[in-house]
Swiss-Prot record:
Matches recorded under InterPro entries: PRibForGlyAmidine_synth_PurL, PurL_linker, PurM-like_C_dom, PurM-like_C_sf, PurM-like_N, PurM-like_N_sf
Residues annotated to bind Mg(2+) 1: E98, N538
Protein's name according to its UniProt entry: Phosphoribosylformylglycinamidine synthase subunit PurL
Protein residues bound to ATP: Y57, K96, D500, G537
């Protein structure tokens, strides 16, 4: 497209062309006031992407301020490529989760693949070596051909990119609900290890220092991707396929190694991934954070396609690109590092003292904008919020009481639900053992990755039960954080901090904004109670299809530290004769439960309650017992209740079964999703020591007969199922649904 074909500044205003880029009339007037003139086409595009929700968080910023972000171990909180937490011995862990929802709905393979690529770059831009990937996925019901296609392609995209770049995908979660039918959620998390002295930041400082472009050449892919991510999906979204980028994991691997070598050089001042809004966001954000300006000559930008305009170059979201600021005179040193990996590092500009983003093209100024107007001074909106009518209706409902006649069939039915069923079909496509540091592979409560050369490991998990959040966003927000911590504790780790990905509908709707506010309130309270500050994150709003929003889904990514490899614990029972305990009492809480969804085909009523003091106390007790060496296995009780938790504990163990006795209301005891509960197994010789450390109730013991037997108080058999039968149902559910032709 030639510059001559671009609309003039006057046309942009008169024909309100800025609206097509996502700017409102008020925002355009504000831009006019900032510049003291009408913006040209390139400048309008730059403002549009930088002021999109995706880049500016203009609708969510006031809510995000509620999160606790400080803690004794926090080295870098929100605002950089990734959060960083100290893990002792001069080492730290860098991690972040991000969404790639809209691109994955349109082009699922590349959408998911480039989501993985982007989050890896965020982590190594901090100077950290990525050691693990996780993902949190949401789809509609697996009975629909389109959902099957999206599911298969998203998983293939994640596997294709992660496996090629050589970083193990060690964990995550997949849930299926009709609310995600048209708008799947694809959240990717990356975790890296870094020495304290290698920590880098995305800043541009030092007048005269050189701005260098490294990595892949710029093409026309992904233009306005950030704006696309800030609007609802509709029938017309399919036409926006060009806004989805294409990834090259082999280029990423070279870029990763070159950048990690460059960060060790004193020549490097700052480094940032060209992510959403590409060259625009990386340059404007680095300059604004550093308190300087940047001038770039766009004729020098490496281009993949002929005749690209400043607008296209600045808004392209071509993958595998980084922007560096290098000390003046040291350009050759940095270029030599990248050349070693077959990559070009090209000087395209310099740091200035006037706090302006100035773009030159063919000898003329193509754009000139104050950097702070694009970054820290972007508009912030305080949206109205209103309690939804459905919430009041759910709160007023009497407690839901399920009726069960056949407990065996109920347990088998729950094990076949895709949200509970084995995700082996998914993680078998991931190389989760590459780099050989994975100690606990996918399928347990949390993945565990050891830190090479040390007697320490990291426990990693992603969690969020969005059904609870739909019923009650504040309670559901607390539960999301608490469950992540439970999973980390069950692995023998102390929870350190979280990263979050807030996936919600349109903030323009007061009921949706209320969900966001309440969820963040609940998460913040739980983070304070459990001592896990928020160190990084991402907001993804406008997750709607034809006006229907997804469930509120604030995914929590948590990292915990195992300070001695002997403390690593898994959920599978270990040997016959071990005693089985339950921590926590069951109440009749079935709102939003797997049982309610299976029996009624929908969810309603009140979410389970949670007492954060009780939660914190039980977690402390269990971790102390694990560290004392008196716990053989630990598993949190979540979807499907105690019955499903027991099944999972025996299905992971070869040839073992369990025999337990349950009193009280059997439906509640077995299937309620009451919070803050665990199933533990303990060797007989550790019984006394365990009971002194933990308040728990002994319910039975591990057997060697390969059968799960649950008896009532009167000795009657309530459940008797062979572990093989349960395992076949549990493992076969997802492959069976994918093969069925409906």
């Amino acid at each position: 497209m030639s510059l001559l074909l671009e609309p003039s500044a006057a046309m942009i205003k008169e024909q309100k062309l800025y609206r097509e880029m996502g700017l409102t009339d008020e925002e355009f007037a504000r831009i006019e006031a900032i510049l003291g003139r009408l913006p040209n086409y390139t400048e309008t595009g730059i403002f549009a992407v930088m002021w999109s929700e995706h880049c500016s968080y203009k609708n969510s910023k006031p809510v995000l301020k509620k999160f606790p972000t400080d803690g004794p171990h926090v080295l870098q909180g929100p605002g950089e490529g990734a959060g960083i937490v100290d893990i002792g011995d001069g080492l730290a862990v860098a991690f972040k989760i991000e969404s790639h929802n809209h691109p994955s709905a349109i082009e699922p393979y590349q959408g998911a693949a480039t989501g993985v690529g982007g989050i890896i770059r965020d982590v190594f831009s901090m100077g950290a070596r990525p050691i693990a990937l996780l993902n949190s996925l949401r789809f509609g019901e697996l009975t629909s051909p389109r959902v099957k296609y999206l599911f298969e392609q998203v998983v293939a995209g994640i596997a294709g990119y992660g496996n090629c770049v050589g970083i193990p995908t060690v964990g995550g979660e997949v849930q299926f609900d009709p609310a995600y039918e048209g708008n799947p959620l694809v959240n990717a998390m990356c975790v890296g290890i870094i020495r304290h002295e290698d920590i880098q930041r995305g800043v541009a400082t030092g007048v005269g220092n050189t701005v260098m472009y490294v990595g892949a050449k710029t093409g026309r892919d992904g233009i306005h991707g950030a704006t696309f991510a800030s609007e609802e999906l509709s029938e017309q979204s399919e036409a926006k396929r060009p806004a989805v980028q294409v990834g090259d994991p082999f280029m990423e691997k070279l870029l990763l190694e070159a950048c990690l070598e460059a960060v060790k050089s004193d020549a490097l001042v700052g480094i940032q991934d060209m992510g959403a809004a590409g060259l625009t966001s990386s340059s404007a954000e680095m300059a604004s954070k550093g308190g300087f300006g940047i001038e770039m000559n766009l004729d020098l930008v490496p281009q993949r396609e002929a005749g690209m305009t400043p607008y296209e170059m600045m808004l392209s979201e071509s993958q595998e690109r980084m922007l560096l600021v290098v000390k003046q005179g040291c350009e050759d040193e940095i270029a030599a590092i990248f050349a070693k990996y077959g990559l070009e590092a090209k000087a395209i500009g310099k740091v200035t003292d006037d706090k302006m983003l100035r773009l030159l093209f063919r000898g003329e100024v193509a754009a000139e904008i104050p950097v702070d107007a694009l970054a820290k001074d972007a508009p912030v909106y305080h949206k109205p919020s209103a309690e939804p009518a459905y919430y009041r209706e759910f709160q007023a409902m009497p407690p839901y009481t399920p009726h069960i006649e056949d407990y065996n069939q109920t347990l088998l039915g729950l094990l076949a639900q895709p949200t509970i069923a084995s995700k082996e079909w998914v993680y078998d496509q991931y190389d989760y053992m590459v780099r050989t540091n994975t100690v606990v592979a996918p399928g347990s409560d949390a993945a565990v990755v050891r830190i090479r050369g040390m007697n320490k490991a990291l426990a990693l998990t992603t969690d969020c039960n969005s059904r609870y959040l739909y019923l009650d966003p504040e309670t559901g927000g607390k539960i999301a954080v608490a469950e992540a911590a439970r999973n980390v504790i069950c692995s023998g780790a102390k929870p350190l901090a979280i990263t979050d990905c807030l996936n919600f509908g349109s903030p323009e709707k007061p009921e949706i904004f209320w969900q966001l506010e309440k969820a963040v309130d609940g998460m913040s309270e739980a983070c304070r109670a459990l001592g896990t500050p928020v160190v990084s994150g991402n907001v993804s709003l406008y997750n709607e299809t034809n006006g229907e929003a997804v469930y509120p889904t604030p995914v929590v990514g948590m990292v915990g530290l195992i300070d001695d490899l002997s403390h690593i614990t898994t959920q599978s029972f270990k040997q016959a004769g071990d005693l089985i305990y339950v921590i926590g009492e069951a109440k009749p809480e079935f709102g939003g439960s797997e049982l309610q969804k299976w029996l009624e085909g929908r969810i309603f009523g009140k979410a389970p309650e949670i007492d954060l003091e009780v939660e914190a106390s039980r977690q402390r007790q269990l971790l102390a017992a694990i560290r004392a060496g008196v716990v053989a296995s630990a598993h949190d009780i979540a979807e499907g209740g105690l019955a499903v938790a027991l099944a999972e504990c025996v299905m992971g163990a070869s040839g073992l079964g369990a025999k337990v006795t349950i009193g009280g209301d059997l439906v509640s005891e077995l299937f309620s999703e009451t919070q803050s509960r665990f199933v533990i197994s303990v060797k007989k010789e550790h019984q006394e020591a365990f009971e002194q450390l933990v308040e728990a109730k002994r319910i039975g013991e591990v057997t060697g007969d390969g059968i799960l037997t649950v008896n009532g108080e009167q000795g009657e058999t309530v459940i008797r199922l062979s572990v093989d039968e349960m395992r076949n149902v549990w493992k076969g559910a997802i492959p069976c649904l994918l093969k069925s032709k409906d």
